Amino acid sequence: MCSNIKINQLKFVIDMKTMKLWRIAFMMLTAFSIASCGSDEPRYADPEAHEKTVQLNEQYGPLMVGTWHYENISDTQCYFERLTFQADGTLTGMRKWQTRKPVTIDGKEQHTDWEDVELSGTFTGTWQLRYWSPEGNSGEKRNCLQLTATYDDAGRDYMAYSCALTFAYADATTLRIQGYYVKAPDGWINYQRGPSEPSF
């Protein structure tokens, strides 16, 4: 009698383990089938911004690649910048910037000597075209050129660029972006294609 009870208990334990294995197998099969119902396409937090970023890069990405320069000289400021954009998203650049102040000496208007601005130097970093709002949810989305660059010489605790500039267009000769350090009266800078050196 004792052996029948032990056999029945053993059968019960085996049946319970078998049922547990079947439940685990069923749950795994269900999980796999649910997971396979999804698309292989990535999901984006803002699909519209992603699509417009793709279009922006298809239209202007190849035109951005190359070297661009900008120079602006006035009575009180000389500014030159050269940017080289690579297809892999890397950036190299050079900035030369000098300023002087108007002064009056013995009733005569003069200028101080030219002084180098500490933001002059060479730098490396990355660039990216994006459709987004740099201000976050409160700002208006727009085409932007995002620049992140550090100076090549050690010891500077500030960036050469860490910004998203409004991007207008790039073509065979001109790159038009919102001014950052300097700008035209309308707030824009027109870079010209090609390598160049400062004239000052």
Locate the predicted segments by residue.
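C-terminal motif of bacterial Sec signal peptides marking the signal peptidase cleavage site
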Residues: 33-36
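N-terminal helix-cap/turn-to-beta initiation motif at the start of protein domains
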Residues: 44-69
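Bacterial signal peptide processing site
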Residues: 38-41
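An anionic, turn-rich surface loop/hairpin at beta-sheet edges
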Residues: 139-166
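Bacterial N-terminal signal peptides that target proteins for export
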Residues: 13-25
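Edge beta-strand at a domain terminus
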Residues: 43-53, 117-135, 170-200
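N-terminal glycine/threonine-rich, aromatic-flanked beta-hairpin/loop signature
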Residues: 77-140
